[in-house]
């Protein structure tokens, strides 16, 4: 088994505690069901002693037993589902933030970490597995338990068994169902945790962290042979672990029951380096004291969640005038090569520059020149300070619309306008954009971007230029695609 650092050990202990808490909750739910069933069983067995054999066979009496058992289990069924979903959501959140916790603490660095969306987690928790939602699978096992318990009671009454004998049968059926629920909980929570951890790996790599992932198996007699073989194996973030014809980006993601169900494996990060840009703001910091995950979460996540929500507004005449003043002051403080880079981008160099950033084909002879413009434009944008939450617009083709809708980061610079009509006019400018749409951008203050306005080569575009590598989320509101910049 791979050696864990102290932060990874902290997370592992927390995961065990979460599992034990879920185990206790499920145990108590099934225990209460068993108590309620045994109360009815006591009545059945006491009454059966005074009934003739033919009376015991009455259909109405058999239906009564079945209905009462169903009612007991249906009463507690929502508690089982709520417990499993709560555990799954908690592990999904910890799978994501736990990675950032170990990265920040082990590397002594504060990272630009995007917050994970609650709706994203709940969609993940509720996602069907093998075509069936969690609720349907739980209903199936609940109905099986109800049928088995009912059959045991009726069979016992027919055969004249004692309360103790029938109760033992019911104990066994209930325990089996409880263990099945626990297996589902472990598998479901493990699945959501693996998905969000993978999401964290990919976002960390995009930030400039040279990171790999390593398979970590719990080595004991219950561990699958295939997972023992995977233990300690390292792959790149985007690669899959492969074993005997199956492949997956992480544990419980094979899509094969024989590899996924009740799996206790995890992955851990292996950091080979941090980009100089990420290190730059942390050079003077001393090594921080050890923080538990809960302490780190309180500092980094709850603190961000408690911040006031942005107040996005469309700029009126005075707001636009103030923004232009900020732009003029910004340009006055730029170096000549930075001003030239801005002019080049807003004239005819933007397409070639963005092709490089999107890793598309480009003319190698032009690369040094274009890369130099990109670097100067980066430096220029970093000096602009956006003071307010603003709304901008961009006219996009159908292809770009789909790319934005299905993405989460802009690798290239992105031109927008504070004037919606500019975006609308762009769509009418060429027939190639006849199926295009206007996209709305919600840009929080402090976002890495710059208002160019009349300092642009295209002075009437009222352009706000977003820097490259910005993360974002999307939402469709009133049939309009809204892009919220995260940073």
Swiss-Prot record:
Enzyme class: transferase
Residue ranges constituting the TR mART core domain according to the UniProt record: 315-487
InterPro entries from the UniProt entry: ADP-ribosyltransferase (IPR003540), Phage_head_morphogenesis_dom (IPR006528)
Organism domain of life: Bacteria
Keyword set, alphabetical order: Coiled coil, Glycosyltransferase, NAD, NADP, Nucleotide-binding, Nucleotidyltransferase, Secreted, Toxin, Transferase, Virulence
Entry's EC annotation: 2.4.2.31
Example of a GO cellular component annotation carried by this entry: extracellular region
List of residues binding NAD(+): 346-358, 394-400, 463
Location relative to the cell: Secreted
Coiled-coil segments: 2-51
Positions annotated as active site in the UniProt record: 394, 415, 463
Disulfide-bonded cysteines: none
GO molecular function, one term: toxin activity
Reaction(s) catalysed (UniProt annotation): L-arginyl-[protein] + NAD(+) = N(omega)-(ADP-D-ribosyl)-L-arginyl-[protein] + nicotinamide + H(+)
Biological function: A probable mono(ADP-ribosyl)transferase, it may ADP-ribosylate Arg in target protein(s). Upon expression in yeast cells causes cell death.
UniProt name for this protein: NAD(+)--arginine ADP-ribosyltransferase EFV
Organism encoding this protein: Enterococcus faecalis (strain ATCC 700802 / V583)
